[in-house]
Amino acid sequence: MGSSKSKPKDPSQRRRSLEPPDSTHHGGFPASQTPDETAAPDAHRNPSRSFGTVATEPKLFWGFNTSDTVTSPQRAGALAGGVTTFVALYDYESWTETDLSFKKGERLQIVNNTEGDWWLAHSLTTGQTGYIPSNYVAPSDSIQAEEWYFGKITRRESERLLLNPENPRGTFLVRKSETAKGAYCLSVSDFDNAKGPNVKHYKICKLYSGGFYITSRTQFGSLQQLVAYYSKHADGLCHRLTNVCPTSKPQTQGLAKDAWEIPRESLRLEAKLGQGCFGEVWMGTWNGTTRVAIKTLKPGTMSPEAFLQEAQVMKKLRHEKLVQLYAVVSEEPIYIVIEYMSKGSLLDFLKGEMGKYLRLPQLVDMAAQIASGMAYVERMNYVHRDLRAANILVGENLVCKVADFGLARLIEDNEYTARQGAKFPIKWTAPEAALYGRFTIKSDVWSFGILLTELTTKGRVPYPGMVNREVLDQVERAYRMPCPPECPESLHDLMCQCWRKDPEERPTFKYLQAQLLPACVLEVAE
C-alpha cells in the first residue's frame, strides 16, 4: 500500500463567539407575537414524486435525475448574475497536485464552474490557481457566505445541531423556513427548569421594501443587521444570540476532480473495522492525506464489469443521509472507497457501550434519518434490497446514513442468490422478495419495519428463537413480531404497517419519515 504523506485530515468544527453584548432587554413581543413553533414534518426539501408515478419496473440505481440530488450543507451558490468572486467558508488543504489550498475567509475568483463539483479557481490572496470543492465556497457578500446561515436544513436538523451539550444557551443559526416561502427562521438554543435544553424557532418575515423583522416594531435592512441587533439585545427572544452553531466541514463531492478509478497503491489500509461474508471494512487513507473507509470484496463476490457499471451510477446519488461513494479499485479484489463514519455500523453501535445510553427520542430520530435517506431512494425510483442496521453507518452527533445501496443485486455467491441460503438475510426480507425475488421499494419498506425492531431492542436479532425456514413459514401464516418491551404502541403500529402482506398497502418512506416525529411517536409512551 502507498506510504502516508501527511497526517490524515479529520473534519474540524468551526465555532465563533459573538462579541459579549449588553444583555439588557428592550421590551418583549406583542401579545400576538410568539416563537414559530409549528411542528413541520421532516420532509425532504426537494420535490417528491408520488408513488403513483413510479415506473412499474424500477431500475436499481439507474436512470437517475440529477436535478433531484442533494448536497449538504447547502451553502455554495451558482455563478448567477455575473458573480465570479467567492469567499471560502472553511479551510481546505489540497489533496492532489491540481487542487488549490485555501483558508477560511479567502477570496477566490472562479475561472470555470462548468465541470461539476470541482471548480477551477484563482486565489486573490496567494495568486495560485487550482481546483476547489464547490461546496466549500459561497458568493462574496451574499447571505450564503455568513457563518450563521445554514440554508435549507430542516427544523429537526437544526435542533440536532443546537442541542449539542457543548453549546451554551443562545447558540443560534438562521435557516430557510420550511413552511413560508421566501421567509427565514432563527433557531436558538435555550434552557429552562421545566423543559431542560430546548430550541426556540422564530419566523423572520420579509418586508416588501426588502427589510426583515421578527416583530414588526423592530425592523432591519438586512439579516446581518437583525443578527447583530439580537446579539446585543434579547428584546423578546428567549435569550440574546451568543454563539454561532458549530458544524463540521462538509464532505467534498468525491476525493478530487477526476479521482474515480484509482490505483490500489494510493490506498493505505490502517485499521480493520469489520468483516462480513463477502469481505472486510477498513479505515484508511487515500493519497496519504484523506481519511476514508475501504470495503474490500473477496474475489468472485461480483463481476468487476457489472460492479463498475453500477458504481458509475451510484456515485451520482447524493443525499445527506446516504453514505457517499468516493472511488473504486475495479480490478479484483475490488475496493470500494466511501466516506468514513466514525462510529461504525448502527448494529455495532446499538450493541456497544454507547447503545446503553440511547433513549427512545434518540432512537426515533435515528429512524427518521434513515427514512429520510430511503425517501430519496424512493423518489429516485431505486431499490436498496438489503436494508438493515448492519448496513447503516453512524457518525458524530448520532448522524445516521444508509450504506451498501444496490450492491446486493450484484452478489454472485450461491449461498446468497438462492435467497434461502445461509448468507441471505431472510429475517429482514419481505416474503415476496424472499420467495419470488420481487425486490421493490415496498420490500425495502418491509425491511425498514424490521430495522425499527433492531433500534428499539438495541440490536437484538429479529424473530428471536426462530431459524430462517421457520420465519418464512410463520410470516406466510400472518405471524408478525409483537411489540418490543418499552416500545410505544404507536411505533409498533408503524412497524405493522410496514409488514402488510400486500406490498401496495405498505406506506411510503415519505409517509414514514413524517410519522417519525418525536411528538407523533412519544405521546403514547409518555
Swiss-Prot record:
Residues noted as binding ATP in the record, renumbered to the chain: L273, G274, Q275, G276, C277, F278, G279, E280, V281, K295
Chain spans, region Disordered: 1-52
SH2 domain ranges (all copies): 148-245
Compositionally biased region (Basic and acidic residues): 7-25
Lipid-attached positions, N-myristoyl glycine: G2
Domain SH3: start-end pairs: 81-142
Entry similarity comment: Belongs to the protein kinase superfamily. Tyr protein kinase family. SRC subfamily.
Listed name of the protein: Tyrosine-protein kinase transforming protein Src
Lineage: Viruses, Riboviria, Pararnavirae, Artverviricota, Revtraviricetes
